[in-house]
């Protein structure tokens, strides 16, 4: 009993035992179980071969080897961009190599005083350059009436020029400015109106209407109409979808105005022919071509082209129109200078002395005949009128 008590006293004095910590790794666990000798004591045949294989496995399973293998064999999304970048670098080096061998501009041209003057002159021309205007004075020897103009014939690969050297671009600009469009809208419409297809439409439409009204020629009219339709399709396809509706609401009216202005500019002496009926027929035709519908009657009343009777599209004043007396005098002068009054020749070949007359002169001849008939007896008037139409 005494021995037990002494042991209890010793144990109480020693205090509680410290608990052993659990193993934290596989090596500690093996050591704790007294298995630390395994598998080091296991011996395989051909130890060198196994160690080499193990080394290869370790190398092949490393991060670097896996990344390299994937980089070389797996297709990448940005591979095309990388190839392009490398090619651009290569080409930039080639370009730098070539540019380094080119002479500098200053070493090729000596900076003399004459060169400086030439440079200043070039800058002056760029600053003050304007498009050349062709303005026809009334003294120029060009035909100013319908009778003196003729269509030279349709050419498949070439537009027929407008009469009296008129410029289609100038005519379109004149029409656009008359509409007083906003500056931004004007710039947009200007690019479309001055396009190649729109210029072709004005040329061919003018000549088609000229032939239709004054010189009927079915073959040339058909050729012109075919090209008009092709040009219209080209223009239609060239207009962006966002502007198409707005543009083709104004285009037929502007084209009709441009054709009307061209007739006024080309034939100022025949301006009396370009009356309200002329404008109505012209507009109806152009609108039917472009939209398939006729415009409202009297649509031309909003046209701001009244000044064309006295002023050209360039702003210069026109010569005053000839009076009826002046037209009669011109007609009589033409008759006296072109008709041979040798009665024997006339009787032998009467058809050779029949002259083609204009609508203007035919109207004047009717006017003079009616005036003479009212002053003479019926028999004399009848003979006189028959004589006038015989000679004319």
UniProtKB/Swiss-Prot annotation:
It comes from the Eukaryota. The lineage of its organism: Eukaryota, Metazoa, Chordata, Craniata, Vertebrata. This is Protein FAM227B. Residues 1-23 are annotated as: Disordered. Pfam families: FWWh. PANTHER family: PROTEIN FAM227B (PTHR33560:SF2). InterPro entries: FAM227. Residues 7-16 have a biased composition (Basic residues). Belongs to the FAM227 family. It comes from Macaca fascicularis.
């Amino acid at each position: 009993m005494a021995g037990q008590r002494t042991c209890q006293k010793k144990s109480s004095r020693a205090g509680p035992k410290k608990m052993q910590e659990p193993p934290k790794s596989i090596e500690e666990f093996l050591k704790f179980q007294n298995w630390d000798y395994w598998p080091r004591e296991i011996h395989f045949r051909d130890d060198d071969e196994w160690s080499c294989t193990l080394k290869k496995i370790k190398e092949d399973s490393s991060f670097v080897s896996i990344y390299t293998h994937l980089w070389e064999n797996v297709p990448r999304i940005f591979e095309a961009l990388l190839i392009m970048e490398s090619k651009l670098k290569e080409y930039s080096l080639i370009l730098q190599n070539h540019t380094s061998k080119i002479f500098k501009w200053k070493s090729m041209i000596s900076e003399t005083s004459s060169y400086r003057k030439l440079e200043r002159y070039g800058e002056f021309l760029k600053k003050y350059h304007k498009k050349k205007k062709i303005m026809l004075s009334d003294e120029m020897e060009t035909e100013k009436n319908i009778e003196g103009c003729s269509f030279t014939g349709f050419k498949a690969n070439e537009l027929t020029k407008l009469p009296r050297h008129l410029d289609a671009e100038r005519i379109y600009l004149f029409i656009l400015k008359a509409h007083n469009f906003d500056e931004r809208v004007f710039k947009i419409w200007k690019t479309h109106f001055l396009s190649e297809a729109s210029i072709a439409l004005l040329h061919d439409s003018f000549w088609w209407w000229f032939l239709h009204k004054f010189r009927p020629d079915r073959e040339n009219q058909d050729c012109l109409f075919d090209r008009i339709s092709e040009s219209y399709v080209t223009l239609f396809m060239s207009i962006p979808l966002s502007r198409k509706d707005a543009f083709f609401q104004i285009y037929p009216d502007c084209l009709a105005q441009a054709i009307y202005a061209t007739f006024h500019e080309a034939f100022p002496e025949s301006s009396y022919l370009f009356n309200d009926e002329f404008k109505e027929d012209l507009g109806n035709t152009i609108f039917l071509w472009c939209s398939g519908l006729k415009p409202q009657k009297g649509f031309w009343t909003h046209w701001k082209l009244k000044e064309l009777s006295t002023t050209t599209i360039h702003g210069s004043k026109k010569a005053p129109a000839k009076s009826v007396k002046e037209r009669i005098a011109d007609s009589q002068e033409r008759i006296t200078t072109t008709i041979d009054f040798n009665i024997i020749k006339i009787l032998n070949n009467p058809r050779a002395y029949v002259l083609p007359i204009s609508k203007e002169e035919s109207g004047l001849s009717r006017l003079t005949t009616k005036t003479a008939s009212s002053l003479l007896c019926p028999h004399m008037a009848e003979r006189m009128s028959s004589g006038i139409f015989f000679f004319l």
